[in-house]
């Protein structure tokens, strides 16, 4: 387990330029405005912010670029954008307006060379590969795409190793079994992937309490990503960091 400061990353779903999956902050003028929400998280002590662009229609993809441009002018913690990134030009257009990292998922599975090409061109520190996993009948974990609907048949550990070998700078590991359940992260796969690769692993899917986040860090994760527990103020980020520090987890306060 690395001794570097562990990171807390709120994740915002953005559809056609608006934050969806409700953000319930008292005193926030417009909870659907990504700039407002990002500023709030910045002031509350988040280490990074991830935007997941879930805009279905390809013609509206330019909107996320406009958002990143606005957010980057107001917020000074790293921004990651995922969703719909298929080619080098998509990555360039986001990095060019102030995005720090991009997260690629399905496109990495269909075109693994995108990992090599993007990390060579932009630097591996910019390239996060998102891996959505589910446990299958034989007890192993498979990689799923299309929002967890389609089993690729790929073994999650083999894919994580390949992603690392191809030059990814981080892995965003989401357990589809625990996602949204608030019952805790899938620690088994978090630990296995963290032990296998020599790059940071971001645990995602299942955070419901401060203890869950502590457990993810104790099982090798370098960062924890969550949405609703932060959006609905069930957990305050500063309180969480104080709790983690009291439990000997290194964090930036």
From Swiss-Prot:
InterPro entries per UniProt: Aldolase_TIM, His_biosynth, HisF, IGPS_HisA/HisF, RibuloseP-bd_barrel
Leader sequence residues: none
Name of this chain's protein: Imidazole glycerol phosphate synthase subunit HisF
One Pfam family of this chain: His_biosynth
Lineage, opening ranks: Bacteria, Pseudomonadati, Campylobacterota, Epsilonproteobacteria, Campylobacterales
Reported function: IGPS catalyzes the conversion of PRFAR and glutamine to IGP, AICAR and glutamate. The HisF subunit catalyzes the cyclization activity that produces IGP and AICAR from PRFAR using the ammonia provided by the HisH subunit.
Annotated HAMAP family: HisF
Protein keywords: Amino-acid biosynthesis, Cytoplasm, Histidine biosynthesis, Lyase
Any single Gene Ontology cellular-component annotation: cytoplasm
Assembly, per entry: Heterodimer of HisH and HisF.
Keyword Cytoplasm: yes
Documented EC number(s): 4.3.2.10
Keyword Cytoplasm found: yes
Protein family per UniProt: Belongs to the HisA/HisF family.
BP terms from Gene Ontology: L-histidine biosynthetic process
Associated pathway: Amino-acid biosynthesis; L-histidine biosynthesis; L-histidine from 5-phospho-alpha-D-ribose 1-diphosphate: step 5/9
Compartmental location: Cytoplasm
One Gene Ontology term of the molecular function aspect: imidazoleglycerol-phosphate synthase activity
Residues forming the catalytic site: 13, 132
Reactions catalysed: 5-[(5-phospho-1-deoxy-D-ribulos-1-ylimino)methylamino]-1-(5-phospho-beta-D-ribosyl)imidazole-4-carboxamide + L-glutamine = D-erythro-1-(imidazol-4-yl)glycerol 3-phosphate + 5-amino-1-(5-phospho-beta-D-ribosyl)imidazole-4-carboxamide + L-glutamate + H(+)
Source organism (scientific name): Aliarcobacter butzleri (strain RM4018)
């Amino acid at each position: 387990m690395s001794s570097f400061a562990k990171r807390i990353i709120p994740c915002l779903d953005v559809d056609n330029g608006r934050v969806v999956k409700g953000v319930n902050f008292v005193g926030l003028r417009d909870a659907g405005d990504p700039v407002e929400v990002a500023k709030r998280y910045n002031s509350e002590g988040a280490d990074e912010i991830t935007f997941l662009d879930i805009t279905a229609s390809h013609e509206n993809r330019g909107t996320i670029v406009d958002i990143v441009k606005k957010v980057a002018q107001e917020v000074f913690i790293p921004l990651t954008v995922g969703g719909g990134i298929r080619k080098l030009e998509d990555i360039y257009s986001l990095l060019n307006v102030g995005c720090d990292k991009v997260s690629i998922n399905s496109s990495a599975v269909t075109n693994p060379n995108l990992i090599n090409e993007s990390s060579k061109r932009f630097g591996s520190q910019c390239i996060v590969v998102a891996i959505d996993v589910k446990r299958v009948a034989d007890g192993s974990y498979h990689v799923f795409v299309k929002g967890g609907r389609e089993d690729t048949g790929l073994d999650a550990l083999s894919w994580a190793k390949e992603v690392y070998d191809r030059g990814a700078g981080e892995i965003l590991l989401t357990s589809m079994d625990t996602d949204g359940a608030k019952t805790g992260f899938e620690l088994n796969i978090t630990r296995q992937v963290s032990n296998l690769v020599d790059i940071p692993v971001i645990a995602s899917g299942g955070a419901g309490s401060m203890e869950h986040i502590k457990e993810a860090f104790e099982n090798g994760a370098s960062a924890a990503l969550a949405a609703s527990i932060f959006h609905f103020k069930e957990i305050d980020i500063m309180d969480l960091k104080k709790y983690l520090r009291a439990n000997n987890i290194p964090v930036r306060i």
